[in-house]
Amino acid sequence: MLEQLRFPHEIAKDIAKQEKNKRKKRKLTQAELSARSGVSLASLKRFEQTGEISFVSLVKIAMVLD
């Protein structure tokens, strides 16, 4: 059972990977997603690389991609 436990940063990176895949599937650049979502380009890049993002920004991105 302990093998199933994951750390928050691992989950965050997985979410970032999923959102990046959605962005690419929709053929959006980071700049386009930034403009459509209202999330700064720097924040979006950091999110895709590290998984770090505010909850509000994550919701904004999800609203564009989902």
Which residue stretches match the model-derived regions?
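A short, Lys/Arg-rich alpha-helix, primarily the initiator
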Residues: M1-K25
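A generic secondary-structure micro-motif detector
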Residues: H9, F47-E48
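Helix-turn-helix DNA-binding elements, focusing on the entry/boundary residues of the two helices
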Residues: E19, Q30, L41, F55-L58
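Alpha-helical residues within the helix-turn-helix
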Residues: K24, A35, M63
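Short alpha-helical DNA-recognition segment
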Residues: K27-K45
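Short, basic-rich loop-to-helix N-cap that marks the start of a DNA-contacting helix
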Residues: T50-M63
